[in-house]
A protein has these predicted regions:
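Hinge/lid segment of periplasmic solute-binding proteins
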Residues: 103-114
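Carbohydrate-associated surface elements
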Residues: 99
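Conserved small/polar residues in nucleotide/adenosyl-binding loops
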Residues: 129-135
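Glycine- and other small-residue-rich loops at beta-strand/loop junctions that grip anionic moieties
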Residues: 95
């Protein structure tokens, strides 16, 4: 049996193919660009993630018996924001964990609601209020 691990990182997607004994059969890394449209902003195109992941899987499995793949696991960036429309289509570049455009809104909400309570309600940092006000 073979297993695939996928790590969607900030600068690249890393893929690993491992057998049931824990032997690494193949490792692939596919880079994608970061975009900085304004100072302090950090974005990526989810389409780039998808394309590089799919290409990476093809490369990872090129010499493997695909019928032996028994499992796949994913990991990725935390606290990114991917906005979808009502048809689950991406409508703008993803706002990444290291983006600083929402500092003012985050400070306001943390002061008004309280950082602990806000985290309890949302289980994430505040970033969507900036979009409502500016996009």
């Amino acid at each position: 049996m073979l297993y695939i691990g996928i790590d969607l990182g900030t600068s690249a997607v890393k893929l690993l193919l491992m057998d049931s004994e824990g032997n690494i059969r193949n490792i692939v890394s596919r880079e994608y660009p970061l975009y900085f449209p304004h100072p302090g902003w950090s974005e990526q195109k989810p389409e780039d993630w998808y394309e590089q992941t799919m290409e990476g899987i093809r490369e990872l499995l090129k010499d493997a018996d695909k019928s032996q793949v028994a499992g796949i696991s994913f990991g990725g960036q935390m606290h990114g924001l991917v906005i979808l429309d009502e048809k689950d289509q991406v409508i703008r570049p993803a706002i990444l964990w290291n983006d600083g455009r929402t500092t003012e809104e985050c400070d306001y909400l943390n002061n008004v609601i309280g950082k602990e309570k806000l985290s309890e309600y949302t289980a994430n940092t505040v970033s969507y209020t900036h979009l409502r006000a500016h996009e």
